[in-house]
Regions:
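Generic structural signal for well-ordered alpha-helices
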Residues: 5-8, 62-66, 112, 162, ...
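Glycine-rich beta-alpha loop elements in corrinoid/cobalamin-binding modules
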Residues: 7-10, 19-141, 494-495, 501-532
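Conserved C-terminal portion of the radical SAM core fold
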Residues: 48-50, 76-78, 195-198, 202-212, ...
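Structural motif
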Residues: 52-54, 244-246, 429-440, 461-468, ...
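Active-site beta-loop-alpha junctions enriched in small/polar residues
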Residues: 54, 82, 165, 214-216, ...
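N-terminal [4Fe-4S]-dependent radical SAM core
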Residues: 116-163, 409-425
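Radical SAM [4Fe-4S] cluster-binding motif and immediate context
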Residues: 147-303, 309-311
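C-terminal accessory regions of radical SAM enzymes
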Residues: 330-333, 344-465, 469-472
């Protein structure tokens, strides 16, 4: 939503703005299935769609836009966001009319002007997209890039969460990150401008504000910002979340952060091996980082501390140091032990062959082996990290039972057809009443559902009133395993396993029957080994 707001403001402020009507973002954007979103798009009849692509939405976005173009042949498409880079593996087909690398605000008015004045014949012909680079445009001040403080688009979400950018640009030049490749200079809002935005968000119901600055304490007026936040949030009704550099943080600054009600601060450490840090351009003074994290803890700010694994030149000893580093804090911090991702446009991706990095071809581009660690070794590292720190969260504590917690919509049953399905949601539970005669339909229905909606989250629930052969359960697991992978599967599944996250199978036992505990345990183990 922040990207849409910035592009809206850029167009409204330009001479190109009067030529366009900006359609409101449909509420279905956050919760709709692909078909729901397609129906909304076709109903709105846009001339241009501008989409922000990230590693978690690019496959779905391209799939949806391809379908939209079949329904709206004259639709023009502009793609931007952190995923857009030259030689992107998913952007080889001529789907988009324009690709924007870097910040879209200085380029967007010119892009849509070009689309508007292009002759129809050239618009209708599918061709390679024109590439626009923000580095070739005059950079905007942040105050000129963001919507005005009182713009209606500046709203918290339904949960009271709002996002606010106060400083654009990062002092770090990390080889694994694409941020510094998109912008080299920095620009910021003045503290009083930020104060005005916080007050307005507060009046509009914000309870938590996440500052999206890549490094909040790199703001040139950092201490003045803290003093302002203390003043406008004296009653601490708003909680703030920030990302900072711990090695430059003083105790007094941490104290001021607490007074402003900054309750969480994310700190990236990544590695403590000097050789690794040199390759990824990540300078580190370990003692100063310790000092900064201790200051946060002393003032009751919970740090999220990030380390990475599968970095170039990283050996098992460095990984062990990283895990011990995180474990020593216990529950005082939120530890994150993250796989290295070869994001398009980053130095690490460009140097992958030279550095001996092998990664997934599709998002999230997770590194599968390095010059020093095999895939088997990385799988063992992931297992150790899960045992020490805990793995990815799962909303469903069990796969077999009379009560199954964490189901998306726990209602409705079907014998293999589409009853019991909430069609408009991007996360859906489909129930099947088991019987031997309808069992063949169940696998076919699962395949058909995922073929129709490959990007939403699916839970398939088999309701039973007797023990069923485990061969039947295994056959449905095979059906799901043969489906095209989802980006969440590629992110979460351990490297030495093929666990599925986006489509999962559950067994719900009728409340009136009692089944053999041994059968239940064996079935639970079977599903637990197949699904997250």
């Amino acid at each position: 939503m922040l990207a849409a707001a910035c592009l809206t403001a850029a167009l409204e402020r330009s001479s190109e703005g009067p030529h366009w009507t900006i359609l409101p973002t449909p509420p279905e954007q956050e919760t709709g299935s692909d078909q729901t979103l397609l129906n909304v798009i076709v109903h709105m009849q846009p001339e241009v769609i501008a989409a922000t692509c990230t590693l978690w939405n690019i496959e779905r976005t391209l799939h949806l836009l391809k379908r939209a173009r079949r329904e709206l042949p004259h639709l023009k498409v502009v793609l931007g966001g952190p995923e857009i880079a030259e030689q992107h593996p998913l952007l080889r087909l001529p789907l988009a009319d324009a690709l924007c690398i870097g910040e879209g605000e200085p380029l967007f008015p010119e892009i849509v002007r070009t689309l508007r004045v292009s002759p129809p014949s050239s618009r209708n012909k599918r061709r390679l997209a024109r590439l626009y680079r923000a580095s070739e445009a005059k950079p905007l001040r942040l105050a000129d890039a963001l919507p005005a403080p009182d713009h209606p688009i500046n709203q918290p979400d339904a949960f009271g969460m709002a996002y606010l950018e106060t400083n654009r640009g990062c002092p770090m030049k990390c080889a694994f990150c694409c941020y510094n490749l998109r912008r080299s200079a920095t620009t910021c809002l003045e503290p009083e401008d930020v104060a005005k935005r916080i007050r307005i968000l507060r009046k509009r119901g914000a309870k938590e504000i996440r500052l999206v600055d890549p490094t909040f304490n790199a703001h040139p007026h950092f201490e003045a910002m803290l003093k302002m936040m203390i003043r406008v949030n004296r009653d601490k009704k708003i909680a703030f979340f920030v990302e900072i550099r711990a090695d430059t943080l003083t105790d007094e600054q941490a104290k001021m952060m607490a007074q402003a009600n900054i309750t969480e601060a994310e700190v990236g450490v990544q590695s403590t091996d000097p050789k690794v840090l040199r390759i990824i351009h990540r300078p580190l003074n370990e003692q100063k980082v310790w000092r900064g994290i201790d200051a946060l803890l002393r003032h009751h700010i919970k740090p999220t501390v990030d380390f990475m694994y599968a970095l170039p030149a990283q050996d098992a000893q460095d990984v062990e140091r990283s895990l011990n580093w995180l474990a020593r804090f216990g529950d005082a911090i939120h530890p994150q032990f993250l796989p290295t991702l070869l994001l398009p446009g980053t130095e690490l991706r460009d140097r992958a062959k030279e550095l001996g990095l092998r990664a997934q071809a599709l998002p999230p581009y997770r590194v599968l082996s390095t010059d020093t660690l095999t895939s088997a070794q990385l799988a063992l590292i992931e297992q150790q990290a899960a045992e020490l720190l805990g793995g990815f969260d799962s909303p469903t504590p069990r796969f077999v039972g009379k009560r199954l917690e964490g189901l998306f919509n726990p209602r409705g049953r079907t014998t293999g057809r589409k009853a019991g399905r909430t069609e408009e949601k991007n996360r859906t539970t489909l129930y099947f009443d088991f019987s031997y005669e309808n069992f063949p339909k169940i696998g076919e229905t699962i395949k058909k559902c995922v073929a129709e909606e490959p990007h939403i989250l699916w839970q398939f629930v088999l309701t039973i009133n007797e023990e069923i052969p485990l061969d039947f359960v295994e056959s449905l697991i095979v059906v799901i395993r043969r489906l095209p992978s989802h980006w969440l599967d590629r992110l979460v599944s351990p490297l030495d396993q093929k666990k599925h996250v986006a489509r999962r199978l559950f067994i719900k036992i009728d409340n009136l029957v009692t089944l053999d505990p041994a059968w239940r345990a064996e079935t639970e183990n079977l599903l637990e080994n197949a699904f997250h």
